Amino acid sequence: SDLNIWERFMNTRHITSLVAAGAAIVMLLSGCGSTGSFSNASSTSGSNIISVYGSEPAHPLFPGAVTEAGGGKVVDQLFAGLVTYDAKGGIHNEVADSITSSDNATHYVIKIKKGWKFTDGTPVTAHSFVDAWNYTANSANKQGSASFFSTIQGYDDLQKSDVDPSATLSGLKVVDDYTIDVKLSQPDSAFPVKSGSHAYMPLPESAFKDPKKFGENPVGNGPYKFVSWSHNRSIKMVKNPDYKGNRVAKNDGLDFMIYTSPDSAYADLRGGNLDFTHAIPSTALKTFQSDKSIKAYNQPGGNTLTFTIPEWLEHFGQDEEGNLRRQAISMSIDRKTIAEKIFNNTSTPAVDFIAAPISAYSKNLKGNEVLKYNPKKAKELWAKANAISPWSGEFGIAYNADGTAKNWVEAICNYIKNTLDIDAKSIPMSTSDEFLSNVDSGKMTSAYRSGWGPDYPSADNYLVQLYDSSSADGKGGNSGNYKNPEFDAMMDKALSAPSTEEADKYYQQGEEILLQDLPAIPLWNQNATAASTSAVSGVAFDYGGGPVFTALTKKQ
């Protein structure tokens, strides 16, 4: 999901796709608005509550609505899906007993384990999943993760403007309380992999009786039980004693302390008023690893950091002028120097649109020279664009000021200004909530920071969910509404491919189209960085480099 949208991290182990299309597969379970300080005392029960950095969720805590990390990290702790992912990106059944594929990966039968229940005591059944998927996929319900279901039969009908909010996916059938039959409109070998993302989490009946109330007080089946959400201050949860899955918490609960500035969170950590943060401010990147007052963590990662120039901006349409200008701007930026000076080498310049942990990642894509610093070429391309339509106005990049983007956005704007001799400036928005509301509603009047951290370990998550037409118009992560039928066709071929190697070839051909159009401009892949107090132990990162909150403990 998006970073801050975007502040998730990934390790650099290569991850291969789970499924070869056409094979029958059974997966068996393998065994606070305030910028001041908070008190470390917790109001929740239990002796080992961990206080962690958080940002105010931009959406209700409805799994299908959440598209950013502020809410995503919370939802991931409160819910459990069909499968989970281990530290290497391996897939393990959680609520699923088996997922069987047939008919060239267009038909799946899912068996659900018995005995799971939500924290309100009601059972988790096949209906819990199917009802949740139908609700999320239906455009009338305005769920940001609708596109995750785009390959299920009947999805297109649910995207019509006059669709009934209760209409369902024709490809979903509840066979019995513990069996789901799924028919797809096209082969989708990534379906079992993405079924562990929070878009696919089950929901109890209470979620549909009063969705607004549920979004404020979610009832889940995950390793933690929701306690409270004090807006712009904290989200509290305690260990769920009835949880039956692979992620049993080693602590008694989590307090997500909501900050509007990672600098404030880091100061609280150093002062002993916060236990753990995964958001190291840019001002501390040069010093945090040598700071004796804390424990520092830094490992190779790969969340993608980009910025998007939406095609509705003047001079930036999906045409020759727009492509020339996006390429010129990209080649104006010295990614390597910014990585050294601002990120202190905790990031590496991007070479494609995905990240090193994913098997389709490549340093050798045709056209990737647009991601290299070349001011002379940038000026030539800008001049060609001016010959089509003379430039006027200013160029801005918006960002959320409560994240870690300020320094690098300002650096990029300086490069663009100095290279192209235009007025370029950064545009801060005070909170993630304000920023994301403008992004989600398509109201941005400038370029804006963007990026991605994985919901599931597949190139599909980076490419289809961000750039496919099915993910545009508020149905997924394609916030710039980029649409290119040629790219869409490559994604369809990748999902239909009989092997990971074959799929990767199509994903890479799709990326070469993106390098021409640049719907977003790739900048860096960042390391997984974090810090804790000396009392905290058990710090670990998942396949995507995100913190494993269930593993955290602290000395009393």
Model-found features: residue ranges?
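Long beta-strand-rich cores associated with HINT superfamily self-processing modules
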Residues: 530-556
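Surface-exposed binding/hinge segments that line
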Residues: 111, 128, 135-137, 141-204
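Structural transition elements
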Residues: 348-385, 402-407
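Gly/Pro-rich hinge or "lid" segments in bacterial periplasmic/extracellular proteins
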Residues: 184-249, 253
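Alpha-helical secondary-structure segments
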Residues: 125-134, 177-184, 222-223, 251-253, ...
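N-terminal lobe/hinge region of extracytoplasmic solute-binding protein
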Residues: 53-103, 219
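Extracytoplasmic/peripheral linker and loop segments enriched in polar/acidic and small residues
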Residues: 173, 339, 423-435, 464-533, ...
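Ligand-site clamp/hinge motif
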Residues: 209-215, 234, 242-287, 302
